[in-house]
């Protein structure tokens, strides 16, 4: 890398998954620990160098190498700077002959020191929606029953939903999706957008050092 020290606010990388396959656009690493470590360790050290003190890094992978990557990330960024292991859950059936269907990717979220974080919200689940209906809604604001006479009382704040948890349900891109650009392992724009909104602000510098289909730049 030729970037100055501490010049990046957020790093997101959809890294090599260690499948050993040739995808045409690139040759993936083999799922061998020494090969994974030799490839990633020097790159992680450089990523830490360019990341600002309040910066964040997200690395996306699947279950083939996430256990090795967690060890490397702890070594480079520090166990105390681990923030979340996010599961991107999708429905994609395969012809697996043994074990449970594999339907999630792993996204490791670390900070360099004290990272910025913008809480993201999601809509209430159906049970909560039913409860909200019982409480009542007036002029778009959530209200609840008074204890004394049963009349409705407005709440002071708008209903934002609930804070986003660490299991993200989001479908893979379909072959006919409009945002498809012909890259086999392309990730949904909405997935990367969620990460950018959570850990960066307007005008921040976001880096993707495994820029496959270019989705991060969109």
Describe each model-derived feature in a short phrase.
Residues 1-218:
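Core catalytic lobe of class I
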């Amino acid at each position: 890398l030729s970037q100055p020290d501490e010049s990046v606010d957020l790093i997101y990388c959809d890294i090599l998954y260690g499948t050993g396959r040739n995808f045409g656009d690139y040759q993936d690493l083999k799922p061998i620990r020494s090969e994974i470590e030799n490839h990633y360790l020097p790159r992680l050290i450089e990523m830490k160098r360019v990341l600002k003190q309040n910066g964040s890094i997200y690395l996306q992978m699947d279950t083939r190498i996430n256990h090795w990557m967690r060890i490397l990330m702890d070594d480079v960024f520090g166990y105390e700077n681990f923030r979340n292991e996010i599961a991107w859950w999708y429905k994609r059936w395969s012809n697996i002959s043994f074990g449970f269907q594999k339907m999630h990717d792993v996204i490791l979220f670390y900070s360099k020191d004290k990272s910025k974080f913008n809480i993201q919200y999601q809509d209430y689940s159906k049970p909560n929606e039913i409860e909200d209906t019982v409480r009542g809604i007036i002029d778009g604001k959530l209200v609840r029953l008074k204890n004394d006479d049963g009349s409705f009382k407005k709440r002071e704040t708008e209903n934002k939903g609930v804070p986003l948890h660490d299991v993200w349900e989001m479908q893979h891109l379909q072959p006919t999706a409009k945002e498809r650009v012909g890259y086999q392992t392309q990730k949904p724009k909405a997935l990367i957008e969620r990460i950018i909104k959570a850990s960066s602000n307007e005008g921040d510098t976001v880096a993707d050092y495994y820029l496959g289909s270019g989705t991060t730049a969109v």
